[in-house]
Amino acid sequence: MGELFRSEEMTLAQLFLQSEAAYCCVSELGELGKVQFRDLNPDVNVFQRKFVNEVRRCEEMDRKLRFVEKEIKKANIPIMDTGENPEVPFPRDMIDLEANFEKIENELKEINTNQEALKRNFLELTELKFILRKTQQFFDEMADPDLLEESSSLLEPSEMGRGAPLRLGFVAGVINRERIPTFERMLWRVCRGNVFLRQAEIENPLEDPVTGDYVHKSVFIIFFQGDQLKNRVKKICEGFRASLYPCPETPQERKEMASGVNTRIDDLQMVLNQTEDHRQRVLQAAAKNIRVWFIKVRKMKAIYHTLNLCNIDVTQKCLSAEVWCPVADLDSIQFALRRGTEHSGSTVPSILNRMQTNQTPPTYNKTNKFTCGFQNIVDAYGIGTYREINPAPYTIITFPFLFAVMFGDFGHGILMTLIAIWMVLRESRILSQKSDNEMFSTVFSGRYIILLMGLFSTYTGLIYNDCFSKSLNMFGSSWSVRPMFSKANWSDELLKTTPLLQLDPAEAGVFGGPYPFGIDPIWNIANNKLAFLNSFKMKMSVILGIIHMLFGVMLSLLNHIYFKKPLNIYLGFIPEMIFMSSLFGYLVILIFYKWTAYDAHTSKEAPSPLIHFINMFLFSYGDTSNKMLYRGQKGIQCFLVVVALLCVPWMLVAKPLVLRHQYLRRKHLGTHNFGGIRVGNGPTEEDAEIIQHDQLSTHSEEGEEPTEDEVFDFADTVVYQAIHTIEYCLGCISNTASYLRLWALSLAHAQLSEVLWTMVIHTGLSVRSLAGGFGLVFIFAAFATLTVAILLVMEGLSAFLHALRLHWIEFQNKFYTGTGFKFLPFSFDPIREGKFDD
C-alpha cells in the first residue's frame, strides 16, 4: 500500500542496445509500458533523424488503412474487433504489409472509379428514359388546338396572317426539383415570354454518382422559335446545371430509342450489381483484419519514433537511450530486454545501467480502475511533486463525503447508487463497445466516484432524514404534545386563538431524548424547521471544514519528515498548527462544549459561540447580555489570541533569518551543499547503487537551502516567506468561510426538492377523482424527469464542482505543491485501446 500514499521511486537509467536488437527490445518495452524515453537529440530536426524514412513509410501505410476504414464505414460494414493483441511485425515484414495495403487501396480506387462511371452512365440513361416517357404527352398536346392559342405569342403577327405552318424548336432535359421555380422565372424574363415550358416530376429520387445522395428531379421540355432563343435557353440550362438530352421528334423514333435505353439500363444494372458485390467482398475481407493491421502499423510507427529519440554511435552498431523507470520494475525491464534480444537473434545482451543525476524524476502513481478516477481529480489540479504525499487515497473518502453533505438525500442517493451499480456491473460490455460518445465516456470513467457519492449521499440523507423532501418515520418521534395539555395548561381556546404553538422541551415528557439515528421526523412539519436545520448544518460545516484543513496541515508534516527538512517542521508546521488550532480549533471546542454543557432546561440561557468568537478577536468582554460559557474563558481566549499572533512573526521572520545564518556559516567554513549528490566517478555496473532520490534537492516552494550553483538571496526569501505567511493566515479565515458552502448547497438542494414535490407530486395527489388517478401517471413521469434533470444532474454537478474546489484549494494547498510532471511511459496500451493520438 506504500505506493498509494506516495509516488513510485524512480530512477534514470541508460540503455545500450545493439542495432540489430534495438527494434525488438523497444517493442518489448512498449508491451511492458514501464519506461519513459528521454529525447537525446533535442537539437536535431525531426526530418533529419535516423529512422525518419521508416516513420514516413508507417504514416503512408496508416493513411491507406484510414482510406480503407472510411470505405468500410461508408458501406455500413461492421469492423471486427476480437480484442486480439498482435505481435509487432519485424522490420522485414514492412515490405509485405506495404504491398498488401497498396493492392487493397488500388483495387478499391479502381472499383470506385469504375462504379462511379457506371453510376453516372446509369443516371444519364435513367434520366433519358424518363424524358422519353414524360415528353410523349407534351408532344401529344402539340396537336391540341388550345395549344395554338397559348403559344400564339411565339409567332410574329405577319406569320399568323400568312397562315404559315407552326414549326417550333425544343430542348428536353432534367433539373433538380427545387430549382424549377427559379428556372421558370429566369426563362420568362430572359426570353420575354417567348418560350413555352412544360415540366413533370420524376416520382422516384435518383442517386448522385459522386456523393451517393438521392436527389429529387423533374423532367422539362422548352418550346421556342429561332436560333437566338435556342442559344439563350441552352445557356440558362447550363447555368442551372440542367442535363440536356437529345429527343427525337417522331413518336416512332422515340419509341425505338426508349426500347434501346431500357435494354442498356438492364445490362448496366447487372454490371453495377456485380461491381457492388465485388466491392462488398473486398471490404468485408478487409474489415476482418483492419483493426489488427492498424495496431501493427501504429506499433511499428511508435517504435521507430522512439528509436529516433536515441543516440547512435559512430560505428552505427549501438544505440544508447536514457529512460525514467520505476525502481520496483527494474527486474521486469531487464527481463523484457533479454526477451527482445532473444527475438532479434542477437548474441550481444542489452545493458541497463542506472545513472546518478540531480534532475527531478517524473511522478508516477500506480492506479487501478477504482483509484484511477480519484487520481485524475488530483492530477487535474497539478501533478504532484516527486515523492510528496499523494492526496488521492484520502480523496477516496473525503471527496464523496463532502459531496454527500451538500447533496444529502436518501432517495436521490439511492438513484445515483443504482445508476453507478449498473455501470459497474456492465463495465466489461461497455468497455468492449468503445463508445464514441464523449459525455457518456466521461461519466462512465467516473463510475466508482459516482458509486461512492451515491452511497455517501444515501448515508447523509438518512442523517438529515430527507427522502425526496419528506422524512422517514422509522423509530417514531421523540417529541410528545400530550404533556403540554396537562402541564402547560394548553386548552381548546388556546388552540383556536393561537395559530402557532411551541413545544417546551423543559416540560417533563415532551422531549424523550436524542433520536436513535439522524434527525427526528417531527421537524419536517415544524414551522421553525429551517431555523433548526440551518443552525445544525452551519455548525457541522464549520466543524468538518476545520478538521479537513487541520488534517491537510498534518499531512505536510509527513512531507517534511520524508524530505528531511527539520527547518520546515519547527518554523513552518508547528506555528501553522498552533495558529489554526488556537483560533479555529478553539471554535470547534466551543461548539461541542455548548452542545454538552446545556440541556433542554438551560438552553434558554445558552450564549452564542459566534458572538464569543468575534469578541475574542476584539478583546471585547463588556457585553453582560452574552454571558461566559465557562469560568476563566476571558483569560484563555486572550492567551489563545496572543499565541496565534506570536505565530505570525514565527512564520514570517524566523525562517529567512535561520537560512541566512546557515548560508553565512557555510560560506565562512568554505563548505558547500551539493543537495545530497555524491561527487566522483560512480560505478557503471548494471547493478550499481544509485543515489537515493529522497535526498535530492527538489524545487519546492519551501525556501530550501541553496545548492552549490545557487546564490542565496535574502530579499527574495523574505518576500516569498511574507507571501506564504499572509496567504496562510488569511487563508485560514477565508477557507473556513468557504466550507459554509456545505451548508448553503445542502439547504438549496433540500429546498429545490421540496418545491418540486409541492409543485408537481402534491398537485397530482390533491385531485381526488378517477381522472386524477390517470393524470397522476403523467404527473409522476414529469416528476421523475425533473428529478433526474434538475436534482440529480444539475444539482449533482454543482455539488461535484464545489467539492472539487474544497479539495483543490482548501485542503490540498496545506501540503500539496503539485509542481511535478507526469510519468508518461512508452506503452502500446493506448494503441490497443484505439487511442491512436501520437
From Swiss-Prot:
UniProtKB keywords: Cytoplasmic vesicle, Hydrogen ion transport, Ion transport, Membrane, Synapse, Transmembrane, Transmembrane helix, Transport
Tissue expression: Detected in brain (at protein level). Highest expression in brain, intermediate levels in kidney, and relatively low levels in bone and liver.
InterPro entries, alphabetized: V-ATPase_116kDa_su, V-type_ATPase_116kDa_su_euka
Subcellular localization(s) per the UniProt record: Cytoplasmic vesicle, Clathrin-coated vesicle membrane; Cytoplasmic vesicle, Secretory vesicle, Synaptic vesicle membrane; Melanosome
UniProt KW Ion transport keyword: yes
Topology, Cytoplasmic side: 1-388, 427-441, 556-573, 660-725, 811-838
Transmembrane segments: 389-407, 410-426, 442-471, 536-555, 574-594, 640-659, 726-750, 772-810
Keyword Transmembrane carried by entry: yes
Subunit structure: V-ATPase is a heteromultimeric enzyme made up of two complexes: the ATP-hydrolytic V1 complex and the proton translocation V0 complex. The V1 complex consists of three catalytic AB heterodimers that form a heterohexamer, three peripheral stalks each consisting of EG heterodimers, one central rotor including subunits D and F, and the regulatory subunits C and H. The proton translocation complex V0 consists of the proton transport subunit a, a ring of proteolipid subunits c9c'', rotary subunit d, subunits e and f, and two accessory subunits.
Function: Subunit of the V0 complex of vacuolar(H+)-ATPase (V-ATPase), a multisubunit enzyme composed of a peripheral complex (V1) that hydrolyzes ATP and a membrane integral complex (V0) that translocates protons. V-ATPase is responsible for acidifying and maintaining the pH of intracellular compartments and in some cell types, is targeted to the plasma membrane, where it is responsible for acidifying the extracellular environment. Required for assembly and activity of the vacuolar ATPase.
Record-given protein name: V-type proton ATPase 116 kDa subunit a 1
Organism encoding this protein: Gallus gallus
